[in-house]
A protein has these predicted regions:
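Walker B catalytic acidic pair
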Residues: 182
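Active-site-proximal or metal-binding-adjacent scaffold patches in catalytic folds
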Residues: 1-177, 186-222
């Protein structure tokens, strides 16, 4: 991706600073004596950060349309956006190697292919987090299920813990918060003070991640 600079602002400052605006444009503040080559060196050094921030800002708009599955599109995994590349034939429809590689032949079913991939990764990762916290605090549960739920981030019934595949798009601490929330529900059915006290005991800063989920849940979709 070529990096387009919206504006370079010369000031008395001694260092070069990069800013990504709410409109996802790059603004640079540089010393009066910094030449273009030096500025571009700093820009290129931070290329990945710039691209990541531009994707995040672009996806932050709640009015953004569903994924189009085109080259360069950003898709979430564990709280980070990774670019999609459409490629020729490969042994599986979708690969993830620090970027998503989708076979051109799978494009007509791209959404379904991604959902199946997310489900598998979600089961592996969320099951591991459930085991970790259950063993740590002695919670007893039957099994973990990955669902297509659209409005609930977790539920529990008859000792089973249910989580939507979309949760794997969230940062790991947010996933941990939801896991802890549901584990506590195995023993505290309602959102009483005792319930929240137990959640806080397991995750003292849980409100931070609860707030993140409330604010950013609209991003966790295709």
């Amino acid at each position: 991706m070529d990096i387009e600079i919206e504006k370079i602002i010369r000031t008395k400052r001694k260092t070069i600073a990069l800013y990504i605006t709410d409109g996802a444009t790059l603004i640079i503040k540089a010393p009066f004596n910094a030449n273009d080559k030096t500025i571009m060196g700093v820009v290129l050094k931070h290329k990945k950060w710039i691209e990541q921030k531009k994707i995040e800002i672009g996806e932050r708009d709640p009015k953004f349309s569903p994924k189009e599955f085109v080259n360069g599109e950003g898709l979430l995994h564990l709280g980070r956006y990774y670019r999609l590349k459409i490629v020729g034939d490969q042994e599986v429809p979708l690969k993830f190697e620090n970027e998503f590689y989708l076979s051109r032949n799978a494009l007509p079913q791209a959404k379904e292919v991604f959902i199946e991939w997310y489900k598998k990764i979600a089961y592996d990762k969320i099951s591991e987090r459930v085991r970790r916290y259950a063993q740590k605090r002695g919670f007893k549960y039957n099994m973990v299920k990955i669902t297509n739920a659209q409005k609930r981030w977790g539920s529990s019934s008859n000792g089973n813990l249910n989580f939507p595949w979309r949760l794997i798009m969230a940062p790991l601490p947010v996933i941990d918060y939801v896991v802890i929330h549901e584990l506590v529900h195995l023993e505290e059915k309602n959102h009483t003070k005792a319930f929240w006290d137990r959640v806080k005991m397991l995750m003292p800063n849980y409100e931070k991640y609860k707030g993140w989920l409330k604010k950013n849940s609209y991003l966790l979709r295709l």
